[in-house]
C-alpha cells in the first residue's frame, strides 16, 4: 500500500510540476497586459548589417526599420521580437513559418509578392551605382563592359547586376553582406557595386575611410515594404494601420530624420 501511495504521490507531484512548467512557458510565449489579457508577440527577421535601416550600436539593434517596427507594435498593441539573419534567408524563413514577418530594407518586387505579402510602402529607396573614389572610368551602367560587380546575394541589386552582366558583359562576385561588397570595391578587387541610395549615402557620410563614391543618377525607384506570410491579412492590417498612424502623427518623420536628416526622406 505504501508503495502504491508513493507512486500516486509521485505522479501527482509530476503532474503539478508539469502544469507549473506549462504555465511558465505560456507566460514566456506571450506578454501579459495590465488587464490580464495576453498580448500577441510576433517575430520579425532583419539584416543587422544594413545601416541606417538596421545595425548594432552599443549591443542593441537600432536603425530606421527597427525603430519603425517597434513604433508600429506600440501603436497596435502587440510585442515584437527582432531576429537578425542573412538577408538571403529572410524570405525563405517567412515561407517556412520560422518568422511572422521581416523588416530589412526589402524592396517590393513582383517576384517576392509571389511568396510573401507586403505592407504599404514605407520608403522609396532606388539603387545607385558605386565605384572606388579613384575610379573615373565608370560613370554609368554602359561603362561596365568587362568590369566586375560586387553584389549582395538575394537583393534587388543582385537582380539588376545580373541584367548588367547579360547586357554589358560584366562579371559578378557575390557576398553575404553589404560591408563585404563595399570593401571589395574599396580595395579595388571589384570595379563597382549597386546599393540603395540612402544606405550608401549614409555609409559615405559617416565613414571617412569608405573610399567610395556614387556615380550617375538613381537606377530605379524601388519602394521598401514590411513582409509578412502569404495570406496573413490580420498582421498585414495591423502593420498598415500602425504605419498610417505614425505617418499622420509625425512620428514616422522623426524616425527617418533621426538617422538621415529631413533632406533624405
Where are these regions (language model features)?
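Ligand-binding cleft/hinge of the Venus flytrap
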Residues: 56, 69-78, 157-175, 204-208
